[in-house]
A protein has these predicted regions:
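Non-heme di-metal
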Residues: 1-212
Length: 212
């Protein structure tokens, strides 16, 4: 009887873990699809942003950021393929339009607004890849974790640069501030704490309301 009870409890535990892994896989897949198309919008927007800048050092910095976003897109696409999924075609078209719209705005919107807007968006991207790494862990995709954390760190670098640019402008004093991300090393430290935890909450992924 005791052995039977233990077996039933073990089976129930496996069932719960299996359901969590399946749910995490679904959420991870959707989040990666959002990230993949979001990177497309970012690339398009940064091309316009770069063209709007006169300062050569700033243009070179945007060039590096564009290359990072292209690498991120390639990495995310590979992960989607491993999950048996791919980009959402309708979302790709939508984010292409969004990116081109922002690109056009950068050419006429002055220096500060593109720097400010990019910083806000990059801050969100940090969290997006952190959540993806946690979902990958629960989804039993450990090979995804390090690349996702590395992408979060690169997005942290982007946010840090855009924040430094924006805060140097007088308009920064009157614009709403977004929350400053924790120190860069906290990305890995917080993931390690999540990994050690017995309670690993799962995120329900939703598309940003502005681009649904």
């Amino acid at each position: 009887m005791l052995t039977s009870s233990i077996a039933r409890a073990a089976a129930a535990h496996v069932g719960v873990d299996g359901a969590r892994a399946r749910f995490a896989t679904e959420q991870l897949t959707f989040l990666l699809q959002l990230a993949y198309s979001g990177e497309l919008a970012a690339i398009r927007a940064y091309l316009g942003h770069r063209a709007s800048l006169k300062d050569r050092a700033q243009r070179r910095a945007i060039d590096r950021i564009i290359r990072d976003e292209v690498r991120h897109r390639h990495c995310v696409l590979g992960q989607l393929a491993e999950l048996g999924a791919g980009p959402i075609a309708a979302r790709e078209r939508k984010m292409e339009r969004v990116g081109r719209g922002i690109s056009t705005f950068c050419l006429v919107g002055g220096w500060f607004a593109p720097m400010y807007g990019a910083g806000r968006l990059e801050a969100q991207n940090i969290r997006e890849y952190e959540v993806a790494a946690r979902l990958a862990l629960v989804a039993e995709r450990p090979r995804f974790v390090d690349p996702l954390l590395e992408m979060a760190e690169v997005e942290w670098d982007h946010e840090h640069w855009f924040r430094a640019m924006a805060t140097a402008h007088p308009a920064w004093r009157v614009f709403p501030k977004w929350r400053q991300p924790p120190p860069r090393e906290e990305i890995r430290a917080s993931f390690a704490a999540f990994e050690r935890s017995t309670d690993r909450p799962l995120h329900v992924v939703r598309a940003p309301w502005l681009v649904r």
